[in-house]
């Protein structure tokens, strides 16, 4: 007897999470892998949009107490396919202002959809130089923006979380 294997799907992962601390501000760079799994290509090319939402949180570590949430930024993007012009369009829905990106290649559109650069979290002057901070990123990808338990079980939505290393603004001696 031959058994049919279920199609493999790519798991949503946060590949690069970089936190940059300089004299002026705290910025974050995030790259999401698997934002457009192969199983969703047919749905996207038939006109159903895919949504990606990044929730970037800046936390302060406090010893022997619960950590304190300092600020949150939400960035939401949409990937839509125009059947007539055969173009993929990536539009920013929330959290950033950028022009609509159009491409005939899904790979290029998926790269623009899943890469977030220079998210400004907080001015450096607003943070205590001796405080220990870290960044937590929660990413969601879903068809038509519907990220529910049923959608995740059906394979049309996924979510993941990743936390950065602990950092401080002052140099350790």
Feature map (PLM): residue ranges:
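N-terminal signal peptide c-region/cleavage motif recognized by signal peptidases
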Residues: 3-7
């Amino acid at each position: 007897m031959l058994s049919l294997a279920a199609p493999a799907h790519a798991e949503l992962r946060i590949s690069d999470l970089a936190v940059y601390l300089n004299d002026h501000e705290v910025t974050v760079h995030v790259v999401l892998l698997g934002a457009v799994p192969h199983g969703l290509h047919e749905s996207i090319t038939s006109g159903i949009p895919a949504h990606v939402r990044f929730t970037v949180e800046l936390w302060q570590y406090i010893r022997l107490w619960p950590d304190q949430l300092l600020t949150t930024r939400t960035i939401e993007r949409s990937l839509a396919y125009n059947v007539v012009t055969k173009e993929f369009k990536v539009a920013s829905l929330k959290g950033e202002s950028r022009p609509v990106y159009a491409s005939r290649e899904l790979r290029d559109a998926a790269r623009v959809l899943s890469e977030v650069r220079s998210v400004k979290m907080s001015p450096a002057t607003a943070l205590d130089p001796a405080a220990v901070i870290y960044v937590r990123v929660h990413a969601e990808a879903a068809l038509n923006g519907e990220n529910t338990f049923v959608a995740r079980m059906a394979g049309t939505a996924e979510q993941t979380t990743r936390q950065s290393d602990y950092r401080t603004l002052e140099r350790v001696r």
